[in-house]
Swiss-Prot record:
General function of this protein: Catalyzes the transfer of endogenously produced octanoic acid from octanoyl-acyl-carrier-protein onto the lipoyl domain of GcvH, an intermediate carrier during protein lipoylation.
Transmembrane segment boundaries: none
A GO BP annotation: lipoate biosynthetic process
Keyword Amino-acid biosynthesis: no
Ranges for domain BPL/LPL catalytic: 31-245
Record's protein name: Octanoyltransferase LipM
Active-site residues, record numbering mapped to chain: C147
Source domain of life: Bacteria
Molecular function terms from GO: lipoyl(octanoyl) transferase activity
Organism: Kyrpidia tusciae (strain DSM 2912 / NBRC 15312 / T2) (Bacillus tusciae)
PROSITE patterns assigned to the protein according to its UniProt record, in alphabetical order: BPL_LPL_CATALYTIC
Pathway as given in its UniProt record: Protein modification; protein lipoylation via endogenous pathway; protein N(6)-(lipoyl)lysine from octanoyl-[acyl-carrier-protein]
PANTHER family: OCTANOYL-[GCVH]:PROTEIN N-OCTANOYLTRANSFERASE (PTHR43679:SF2), OCTANOYLTRANSFERASE LIPM-RELATED (PTHR43679)
Catalytic activity line of the entry: octanoyl-[ACP] + L-lysyl-[protein] = N(6)-octanoyl-L-lysyl-[protein] + holo-[ACP] + H(+)
Length: 274
């Protein structure tokens, strides 16, 4: 049985969270730390965009500033996510890990099995999305800059709606997959900080988003605590990966690397470069 490290790093800033994810990747690529599952949150609430998105065209920075939200460009792909009432997970594992498929899509399936099992432990009938023809067309030509408006292959849905949004990158022979499990959902806040051609288009796309996204609170009819979700996810990932998760801390080297990388994730050259 493989041993993984489990990190609970609490709430952090946008730059800190992305810097830590990358620092763990670097440390794992050097063989300094084992495969790692990290669970964390965001303070302040933050809009993150995917690596390939165009910040100036898709983000309303005046609205973002007025609400006091943070902003960061992720090293992974995907679309915009407002990180607020959620549990965020990140998985760092070698591409050569036993049983890890070479393709991005199939590795999503293997890693995300931990999400499915964890959510089922909470009593939710979670399963993988396999988009129909209409869904595939939406993926080929996304209707908005927002994540969660349609599920991709092997993303996690409950009652036909997307609950978890994930993205992945690979560097130095290492996979980083991270994503958001929605504790609650505020479409108004998300769509207020994105740009649209008109209010009419904004309202139409917001309705589409609401038809395809769901939160744990929506499903349970009551709040679900982050602590419960984190505990269930840790159990689910351990089962899915056939691994033993040992609670740990960031190493001194990871902390030093993360401190250095924060400058990157705070820099305009990174965040506004497209």
């Amino acid at each position: 049985m493989q041993t993984w490290r489990l990190l609970h790093t609490g709430k952090g800033s946008a730059a800190f969270n992305m810097a830590v994810d990358e620092a763990v990747m670097i440390a794992h690529s050097r063989g300094e730390v084992p495969p790692t599952l990290r669970l964390y949150g965001w303070d302040p609430p933050t809009l993150s965009i995917g690596y390939f998105q165009r910040a100036g065209k898709e983000v309303d920075f005046e609205a973002l500033s007025a609400r006091g939200y943070g902003f960061v460009r992720r090293p992974t792909g995907g679309r915009a996510v407002l990180h607020d009432r959620e549990v965020t997970y990140s998985v760092v594992v070698s591409e050569s890990y036993p049983g890890m498929p070479g393709s991005v899509t199939e590795s999503y399936r293997v890693i995300s099995e931990g999400l499915v099992r964890g959510l089922r432990k909470l009593g939710f009938d979670a399963h993988f999305a396999r988009p129909d023809e209409e869904g595939r067309q939406r993926l080929a030509a996304p209707s908005s800059a927002a994540c969660f408006d349609s599920p991709s292959w092997y993303e996690v849905v409950v009652e036909g709606k997307k609950l978890v949004g994930s993205a992945q990158t690979r560097q130095r022979g290492v996979i980083l997959q991270h994503g958001s499990i929605l504790l609650d959902l505020d479409p108004e806040a998300l769509f207020a900080v994105l740009r649209f051609p008109s209010d009419r288009v904004r309202d139409r796309l917001r309705r589409t988003f609401e038809e395809h996204a769901v939160s744990l609170r929506d499903l349970a009819g009551a709040p679900v605590s982050a602590e419960r979700v984190e505990e269930a996810l840790a159990e689910g990932f351990a089962e899915a990966l056939g691994a033993r998760l040992e609670p740990g801390e960031l190493t001194a080297e990871e902390r030093e690397t993360a401190e250095q990388l924060m400058a990157k994730y705070l820099a305009d050259e990174w965040n506004y470069r497209k």
